[in-house]
Amino acid sequence: MIKNPKVLILTAHYGNGHVQVAKTLEQTFRQKGIKDVIVCDLFGESHPVITDITKYLYLKSYTIGKELYRLFYYGVEKIYDKKIASWYANFGRKRLKLLLQAEKPDIVINTFPIIAVPELKKQTGISIPVYNVLTDFCVHKIWIHREVDRYFVATDHVKKVMVDIGVPAEQIVETGIPIRSSFELKINPDIIYNKYQLCKNKKILLIVAGAHGVLGSVKELCQSFMSVPDLQVVVVCGKNEALKQDLVGVQETNPDALKVFGYVENIDELFRVTSCMITKPGGITLSEAAALQVPVILYKPVPGQENENAMYFERKGAAVVIRDDSEVFAKTEALLKDDMKLLQMKEAMKSIYRPEPADHIVDTILAENHVEPNHIPIKSPALAQSFT
């Protein structure tokens, strides 16, 4: 039995999802009394220049680099068993060895497909349990390695795909993707309507426009939607200050029809009152939408995991996928008018959702390492406390 285990969570800053999952797991471990938890961006610390270049190329995949990313994602999938696997397995290895020597972790978790640890296990024989937490509704071969002890995946579909490519079923646990605990609280929606000055008698369209590549014509689209009766449009611009300032002028023409926000810390609050949401199909965003049963309109998925996520949610009846700018207004307006379709999509989201995935993952890891959790009460957010 490990009395006070040290947990090392390896991640990478390609988008916010991998890091967000790492932070959620870190918080969950701490809630269960495991205080010694380290989150490390292994690639960023090992090769900062290469990482900056690849992050830039990753962001360009949302605009001019879609075909390049398609070639990378699906091309690597086909040739992964050859030379690329050997090169990638050693990426970050020097920094990893120093990290393991300095920190001496008892448990290693990957929220990004980093196979340096299992490869090091294979080559040196070190004994340390390694867990991979997949952050999409699909799987790429780059996540798979014989020295990984267990995989935590979003759905049974992902598990079946992994079994088909040779991963033993007993090594795969269907838990869902870890999301922030705020998405699993019960909150009185009336408080949210008042906080954001929204009308509970109108439908609400949420546009998450801060994400990379979401809707190049947000301003024109908002102007079109403002003419739709009994509809309020809420746009979250994130850290895109230029977009926010551009939309503020539009909002001033009809502040009841359009609400514009920058970065919203508790975005789950807006999820709870929206009728449907336009967004990009990132694994974490879709998991959060599933938790609160929000029908989604997925805008122009990038080839790779985004496209795989979008196709899965479309097959399940939980999403409408739009691949052409000219379709956005018409398809969104039609969906907002179709209450039966919206209800069916909410039910589909409910069927996809797996409750408390972070707890499930952490409890499984602690049990396998014979660690007894010591739950620490966490104070609920102020808005959640107002629920009656």
UniProtKB/Swiss-Prot annotation:
Catalytic reactions of this protein: a 1,2-diacyl-3-O-(beta-D-glucopyranosyl)-sn-glycerol + UDP-alpha-D-glucose = a 1,2-diacyl-3-O-(beta-D-Glc-(1->6)-beta-D-Glc)-sn-glycerol + UDP + H(+); a 1,2-diacyl-3-O-(beta-D-Glc-(1->6)-beta-D-Glc)-sn-glycerol + UDP-alpha-D-glucose = a 1,2-diacyl-3-O-(beta-D-Glc-(1->6)-beta-D-Glc-(1->6)-beta-D-Glc)-sn-glycerol + UDP + H(+); a 1,2-diacyl-sn-glycerol + UDP-alpha-D-glucose = a 1,2-diacyl-3-O-(beta-D-glucopyranosyl)-sn-glycerol + UDP + H(+)
Keyword Ribosomal protein: no
GO biological process, one term: enterobacterial common antigen biosynthetic process
A GO CC term attached to the entry: plasma membrane
Keywords, alphabetical: Carbohydrate metabolism, Cell membrane, Glycosyltransferase, Lipid biosynthesis, Lipid metabolism, Membrane, Transferase
Superkingdom, taxonomy of origin: Bacteria
Keyword Lipid biosynthesis: yes
Gene3D superfamilies listed in its UniProt record: Glycogen Phosphorylase B (3.40.50.2000)
Enzyme class: transferase
Pfam families for the chain: Glyco_tran_28_C, MGDG_synth
Protein family according to the UniProt entry: Belongs to the glycosyltransferase 28 family. UgtP subfamily.
Function, as annotated: Processive glucosyltransferase involved in the biosynthesis of both the bilayer- and non-bilayer-forming membrane glucolipids. Is able to successively transfer up to three glucosyl residues to diacylglycerol (DAG), thereby catalyzing the formation of beta-monoglucosyl-DAG (3-O-(beta-D-glucopyranosyl)-1,2-diacyl-sn-glycerol), beta-diglucosyl-DAG (3-O-(beta-D-glucopyranosyl-beta-(1->6)-D-glucopyranosyl)-1,2-diacyl-sn-glycerol) and beta-triglucosyl-DAG (3-O-(beta-D-glucopyranosyl-beta-(1->6)-D-glucopyranosyl-beta-(1->6)-D-glucopyranosyl)-1,2-diacyl-sn-glycerol).
Identification of the protein by name: Processive diacylglycerol beta-glucosyltransferase
Species whose genome carries this gene: Bacillus cereus (strain ZK / E33L)
Lineage: Bacteria, Bacillati, Bacillota, Bacilli, Bacillales
Gene: ugtP
